[in-house]
C-alpha cells in the first residue's frame, strides 16, 4: 500500500516509472477506504524506459488517498522490495510532454504520450474537428482502454484535450461513435452523444453525452443500453438517416454486422444483419461505418458499408474492406457477388477507418489508424505509439461495371503545403509526381536504406517495397512488398512522407497505399525512372 499524504496530493501528478518488458502491476486508487480508480501499468523492475503521470486533480477533495499496488510475477519479499520502481516513483508539479522521438510525425495526429489505436467518436462542430481515440494514458502499449481526445481547426495540426471518457465498473472503454444531436431527439439540442463498447466480462454498449461540445461527458445512468452474450459485440457507429428520419446504428458482431434503428439514441431496435459469406472472413470484423454517397459522373447515389478486419488484410494482418450497395434504413443489400472483396487501402498500415459525423458541405472525411496489429505494440518508439493517417475525402466511382470507393487527400492537405515547390526531399513533405506511363520512384538515404515504388501502367498495378526501408528487426511481419490495383491509369501520384510513414494516393482517388517505415536517418534522395516529373512541397 503506497500512501499519499495531503501535501503530495496538492502536487500536479505522481510520476510512475515504466519498463516495457516488465510484468503488469494492478493499481487500485483507494480513498475513504473505497476504490475510486483502477488501472494496469508495467512498473519498472530493473530500469526505467519512461514515466507516465497519474494526475492528482482526479482525486480532488478525497481523503485518505492510497495506491494498492499488486505486482504480478513470482517475487520473494526481498525481490519485490528491490524493484526499481519504488525509488523512482515521485511526485512532480509538471510532466514533460516535449517530443523526444525521432519518428514522431509532423502533420499526422499522434498521442502526446501513451498508446493509441482506433479513431473513435469523430465529429465536426462549430469549426472544430473532434477526434477521440483508443488510448492508454499509463503506457505506450495496449492496455487500460480509455477515450483520448484531440481537436483541430484544419485537420493537420492537433491539440490534445485529455481523456474525457474513462473506464468504470461496467468495463474499459472500447471503440464507438459520436453524433451531434441537431434534432434534439433525446439529450438537449446540439448535445454530442457518444455510444461506445463497455468491455467487461461481456461486451455491452453504453452511452455518454456532452453539452460543452465534447470536452466533458456525462455517462447515461441507464448504462449499458444494449447487451448480448456474443463475445465480439462492439464498435457501434450511429448516424442520422434523413431517408427514414431516424437514427441508424451499425455494429460489429463476430464476423458480421448488425443494423439497428432508434428515435431517441437511447432505445435501439434490431433491424437486420449483413455479412455472412460476403467479402473476406480471415479475421474478426470490427469498426464499421455506413454512409450514402454520390457516384462520380452519374446521377446515382449508393451506400458504402465499411468493415475493418483483423487479420485477413491483402498484405497480412489488419485492413479495411468495404461493400457497395443499397440501404433502406432497415437492411443493407450488397451489389457485388459474395466472393468479391474490395479494399480501401492496400498498404499494411491502414486500419479502423471511420468518418466524421456532421462534416461540412456533405463531405465524407475519414481517418485511419496507421499501424497493424501484427506489430503495433513493438514499433521502435516509446514516448508514444501509433499515429493516424492523413484525412481523406471519400467518394464513389465506377470501373468496368463495378462501383469502388475513391480516396483522395482532403483539401486541407493541399492548404498545408509550403508556397514554393522544389526538388529537395525532406523528412516531412508531399511529393507530387505527374506520370505518363510506367515509373519507378525510389526514396533513399546514405545508409543504403530505401523504399521503392513501382507503377505498371499496362498491368494497372502500383507497388511499394519496404524490405530495405530501415529498422525492421522488431517483427518478422514488417518487411513487405504491398501491391494494389489502380483501376485504370494514374496520371498524378501524391506521396506524403512524414518521418515514419509513406502514403501514396492517386490524385483521382482510384488507389491508396499506406505503409510505416523506420529509416535510421531520413530519406534525402529521390530518383524517378520513367516518364515522370515531380515537385516537393514542405508541410509543417
Segments predicted by a language model, with ranges:
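Aromatic-lined carbohydrate-binding/catalytic grooves of carbohydrate-active enzymes
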Residues: 111, 126-155, 168
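Acidic, glycine-rich loop-and-beta core segments that form the ion-binding/anion-interacting portion
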Residues: 293-295, 303, 311, 315-329
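Structural motif
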Residues: 25-26, 78-79, 142-146, 202-208, ...
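Beta-rich accessory regions
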Residues: 1-37, 56-76, 92-95, 297-298, ...
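Flexible loop/turn segments at secondary-structure boundaries
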Residues: 24, 138-140, 167, 171-174, ...
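Beta-propeller blade signature
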Residues: 148-152, 206-213, 261-263, 318-329, ...
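Hydrophobic core segments of beta-strands in well-ordered, beta-rich domains
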Residues: 16, 67-70, 118-138, 160-163, ...
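Surface loop/turn signatures of beta-propeller and other carbohydrate-active proteins
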Residues: 35-54, 78-120, 139-142, 157-189, ...
Amino acid at each position: 500500500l503506497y500512501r499519499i499524504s495531503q501535501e503530495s496530493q496538492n502536487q500536479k501528478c505522481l510520476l510512475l516509472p515504466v519498463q516495457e518488458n516488465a510484468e503488469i502491476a494492478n493499481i487500485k486508487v483507494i480513498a475513504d477506504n473505497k476504490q475510486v480508480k483502477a488501472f494496469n501499468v508495467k512498473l519498472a523492475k530493473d530500469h526505467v524506459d519512461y514515466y507516465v503521470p497519474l494526475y492528482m486533480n482526479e482525486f480532488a477533495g478525497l481523503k485518505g488517498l492510497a495506491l494498492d499496488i499488486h505486482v504480478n510475477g513470482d517475487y520473494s519479499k526481498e525481490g519485490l522490495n528491490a524493484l526499481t520502481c519504488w525509488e523512482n516513483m515521485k511526485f512532480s508539479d509538471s510532466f514533460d510532454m516535449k517530443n523526444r522521438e525521432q519518428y514522431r510525425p509532423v502533420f499526422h495526429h499522434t498521442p502526446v504520450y501513451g498508446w493509441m489505436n482506433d479513431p473513435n467518436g469523430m465529429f465536426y462542430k462549430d469549426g472544430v474537428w473532434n477526434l477521440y481515440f483508443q488510448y492508454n494514458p499509463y503506457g505506450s502499449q495496449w492496455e487500460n482502454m480509455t477515450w483520448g481526445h484531440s481537436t483541430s481547426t484544419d485537420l493537420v495540426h492537433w491539440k490534445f484535450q485529455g481523456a474525457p471518457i474513462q473506464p468504470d465498473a461496467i468495463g474499459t472503454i472500447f471503440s464507438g461513435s459520436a453524433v451531434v444531436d441537431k434534432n434534439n431527439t433525446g439529450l438537449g439540442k446540439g448535445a454530442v452523444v457518444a455510444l461506445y463498447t463497455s468491455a467487461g466480462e461481456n461486451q455491452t454498449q453504453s452511452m455518454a453525452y456532452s453539452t460543452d461540445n465534447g470536452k466533458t461527458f456525462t455517462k447515461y445512468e441507464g448504462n449499458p443500453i444494449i447487451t448480448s452474450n456474443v463475445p465480439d459485440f462492439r464498435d457501434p457507429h450511429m448516424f442520422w438517416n434523413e431517408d427514414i428520419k431516424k437514427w441508424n446504428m451499425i455494429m460489429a458482431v463476430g464476423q458480421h454486422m448488425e443494423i439497428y434503428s432508434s428515435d431517441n439514441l437511447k432505445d435501439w431496435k434490431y433491424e437486420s444483419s449483413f455479412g455472412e459469406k460476403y467479402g473476406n472472413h480471415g479475421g474478426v470484423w470490427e469498426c464499421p461505418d455506413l454512409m450514402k454517397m454520390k457516384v462520380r459522373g452519374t446521377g446515382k447515389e449508393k451506400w458504402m458499408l465499411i468493415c475493418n478486419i483483423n487479420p485477413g488484410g491483402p498484405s497480412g494482418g489488419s485492413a479495411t474492406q468495404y461493400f457497395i450497395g443499397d440501404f433502406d434504413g432497415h437492411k443493407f443489400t450488397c451489389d457485388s457477388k459474395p466472393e468479391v472483396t474490395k479494399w480501401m487501402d492496400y498498404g499494411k498500415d491502414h486500419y479502423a477507418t471511420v468518418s466524421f459525423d456532421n462534416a461540412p458541405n456533405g463531405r465524407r472525411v475519414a481517418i485511419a489508424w496507421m499501424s497493424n496489429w501484427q506489430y503495433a505494440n513493438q514499433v521502435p518508439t516509446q514516448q508514444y505509439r501509433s499515429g493516424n493517417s492523413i484525412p481523406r475525402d471519400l467518394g464513389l466511382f465506377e470501373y468496368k461495371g463495378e462501383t469502388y470507393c475513391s480516396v483522395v487527400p482532403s483539401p486541407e492537405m493541399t492548404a498545408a503545403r509550403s508556397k514554393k515547390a522544389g526538388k529537395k526531399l525532406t523528412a516531412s513533405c508531399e511529393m507530387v509526381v505527374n506520370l505518363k506511363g510506367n515509373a519507378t520512384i525510389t526514396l533513399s538515404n546514405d545508409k543504403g536504406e530505401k523504399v521503392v515504388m513501382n507503377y505498371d501502367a499496362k498491368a494497372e498495378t502500383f507497388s511499394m517495397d519496404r524490405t530495405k526501408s530501415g529498422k525492421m528487426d522488431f517483427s518478422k511481419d514488417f518487411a513487405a512488398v504491398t501491391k494494389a490495383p489502380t483501376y485504370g491509369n494514374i496520371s498524378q501520384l501524391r506521396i506524403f512522407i512524414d518521418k515514419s510513414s509513406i502514403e501514396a494516393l492517386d490524385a483521382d482517388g482510384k488507389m491508396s497505399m499506406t505503409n510505416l517505415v523506420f529509416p535510421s536517418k531520413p530519406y534525402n534522395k529521390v530518383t524517378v525512372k520513367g516518364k515522370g516529373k515531380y515537385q516537393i512541397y514542405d508541410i509543417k
